[in-house]
Amino acid sequence: MGLPWYRVHTVVLNDPGRLLSVHIMHTALVAGWAGSMALYELAVFDPSDPVLDPMWRQGMFVIPFMTRLGITNSWGGWSITGGTITNPGIWSYEGVAGAHIVFSGLCFLAAIWHWVYWDLEIFCDERTGKPSLDLPKIFGIHLFLSGVACFGFGAFHVTGLYGPGIWVSDPCGLTGKVQPVNPAWGVEGFDPFVPGGIASHHIAAGTLGILAGLFHLSVRPPQRLYKGLRMGNIETVLSSSIAAVFFAAFVVAGTMWYGSATTPIELFGPTRYQWDQGYFQQEIYRRVSAGLAENQSLSEAWSKIPEKLAFYDYIGNNPAKGGLFRAGSMDNGDGIAVGWLGHPIFRDKDGRELFVRRMPTFFETFPVVLVDGDGIVRADVPFRRAESKYSVEQVGVTVEFYGGELNGVSYSDPATVKKYARRAQLGEIFELDRATLKSDGVFRSSPRGWFTFGHASFALLFFFGHIWHGARTLFRDVFAGIDPDLDAQVEFGAFQKLGDPTTRRQVV
């Protein structure tokens, strides 16, 4: 046929059987990729430390999505929450991966069958004897079936009525586990961080989909609307489908980047806004203050801070710190976290407590500045020593650790104090193993960042695809050069102005 690469899809334009075939093959490729990717991730995933080396630090992409839907165990005998298990059941990580691969194989065979047996009676219009599809009817069928699936997911899977529930956690991502969720029918269901909204919205949207599907199955579109929206043209279906996909992609890019109940930080890592707003730092200080109010010592109060919470309060876990094109997991960047050294508290020679100003998200380097409780600069690491007034040496800064591995240890040596002041810019201080993976020390983004970038980028491309195909189908006659109102053959010389019937030349 000699089609250019960008026109090859015209071969299925008027061939319903093979149109179905290529869509089944597409499903086979998607399911096959998902299953294969899951097996690859399981082969390289280390489940030994869910606190300091969770899935998102290791760059896992499909494991978090399986986990949020209720999969927590492996046939390898481990659980995502730590510890060992003896009976993971069929729906383990490997079971889900295998199911996708088997499904992919079946779709592959079905696609071949439909490619070979394309000329089926079901695709033949009785009136014309030509292949055709009743697109409004197919729309109704798809709407009804997707509504049933949506309702079933919300009413059974999420609620635990017939299924495991979903991943639910606290606002600080410490106590996450899979559990049934009751639908939230009040105004709280519209809070993106309330898991109950997931159940209620799926039930409501599914019900609407079922009713809308039945409506489109039982009511034919008016002729004027049918013609106006080109409902008989398969490119109309393509255009509106692309619209649905790009809209969904924009929505999930937002829920992933800004955070929601559907994207728990235990599975995808924290958001950049939690670093920008000092979210975990505030929670840590709140807990320490509560401990001091109960007459605990500073050391005791800091020792009770969960290592998991302290680890969230570290800039290396901020998804906006990694460059978009820096390949690899977070562990390949700053290394594998081994342990929390503790919280450093700096004091000057007058005993005044000093706080290191933290690095903002979009800085690669940042001056080391120590301020007191009123925000007044009291010490720094100067760029020019000759002009310094606040250097660590001049101010006599010391550091003492509370909690963590260095609990109770203090340093007054200026070089050591400056080292820990620099590290305190990055949040809580952790010992990082950069040797095992030959980590290069350059921050990487988490799967939260990759997902957002990928979906926002493709949503933009698909938006243009929607405009393109929508214009093609709505203005098909214009692009084809065929005017339905044309009553005379347009030819050179027939009119004084080409195509203008009011300027017809007079025949002498």
Swiss-Prot record:
Main location per the UniProt record: plastid
Any one GO CC term of the record: photosystem II
Gene3D superfamilies per UniProt: Photosystem II CP47 reaction center protein
Keyword Chloroplast: yes
SUPFAM superfamilies recorded: Photosystem II antenna protein-like
Alphabetic keyword roster: Chlorophyll, Chloroplast, Chromophore, Membrane, Photosynthesis, Photosystem II, Plastid, Thylakoid, Transmembrane, Transmembrane helix
Membrane topology: Multi-pass membrane protein
InterPro entries xref list: PS_antenna-like (IPR000932), PS_II_antenna-like_sf (IPR036001), PSII_PsbB (IPR017486)
GO MF, one example: chlorophyll binding
Record GO biological process: photosynthetic electron transport in photosystem II
The keyword Thylakoid is assigned to this record: yes
Subcellular location: Plastid, Chloroplast thylakoid membrane
Cofactor binding: number and manner: Binds multiple chlorophylls. PSII binds additional chlorophylls, carotenoids and specific lipids.
Chain ranges passing through the membrane: 21-36, 101-115, 140-156, 203-218, 237-252, 457-472
Pfam family, one: PSII
Function in brief: One of the components of the core complex of photosystem II (PSII). It binds chlorophyll and helps catalyze the primary light-induced photochemical processes of PSII. PSII is a light-driven water:plastoquinone oxidoreductase, using light energy to abstract electrons from H(2)O, generating O(2) and a proton gradient subsequently used for ATP formation.
Quaternary state and interactors: PSII is composed of 1 copy each of membrane proteins PsbA, PsbB, PsbC, PsbD, PsbE, PsbF, PsbH, PsbI, PsbJ, PsbK, PsbL, PsbM, PsbT, PsbX, PsbY, PsbZ, Psb30/Ycf12, at least 3 peripheral proteins of the oxygen-evolving complex and a large number of cofactors. It forms dimeric complexes.
HAMAP family: PSII_PsbB_CP47
Family: Belongs to the PsbB/PsbC family. PsbB subfamily.
Protein name as annotated: Photosystem II CP47 reaction center protein
Source organism (scientific name): Gossypium barbadense (Sea Island cotton)
